[in-house]
């Protein structure tokens, strides 16, 4: 007599072994970090290789202010005379106008927005690419791996059932007419009479 294996299919973990990206730069970086992960016994290179394989939505962007805050927390524990670690982001770095002053940071990322690059270099920092990082820190020594919030996307706000008690899901609304749904409630003039 057999046993019902319920829920086994749900526990499957998707692990990517190749990229679906057509970007030649990312493809070369995947080759480079796969080689480094095999040759050096470093968990950093394995992690970077795994993150390079991820889809665009799983390589979430991060703001400059978030990097600055994380690096400030990290630098509290630094010994005197020791160089600050390089912030490594497998994704995009975006500017944050809410933060007036940015400290001198060494940041490595796949892409920098124009204003973010200007602000980092203007503050006396350095913007590195991943092939430059492989030369500077082939084993990932003195680096700090960061990533952005995946839940920051607009589409994630709509996940779930809107209007259900305890749910904070954002409803899909259209502002095409006065009888149509504006938010989750009807307008006062058009309430049920």
UniProtKB/Swiss-Prot annotation:
Q: Which GO terms describe its biological process?
A: translation
* Subcellular location field: Cytoplasm
Q: Does the keyword Cell membrane apply?
A: no
Residues covered by region (Disordered): 158-193
Write down the Gene3D superfamilies for this protein, in alphabetical order.
3.100.10.10
Keyword set, alphabetical order: Cytoplasm, Ribonucleoprotein, Ribosomal protein
| Top-level division of the source organism's lineage | Eukaryota
> What GO CC terms are in its UniProt record?
cytosolic large ribosomal subunit
- What InterPro entries would the database entry show? Ribosomal_eL18, Ribosomal_uL15/eL18, Ribosomal_uL15/eL18_sf
Spell out the Pfam families in the cross-references. Ribosomal_L18
Basic residues biased stretches: 183-193
GO function terms (MF aspect) = RNA binding; structural constituent of ribosome
Give a yes or no for keyword Ribosomal protein in this entry. Answer: yes
Which family is annotated?
A: Belongs to the eukaryotic ribosomal protein eL18 family.
Q: What's the protein called, per UniProt?
A: Large ribosomal subunit protein eL18
Write down the species. Trypanosoma cruzi (strain CL Brener)
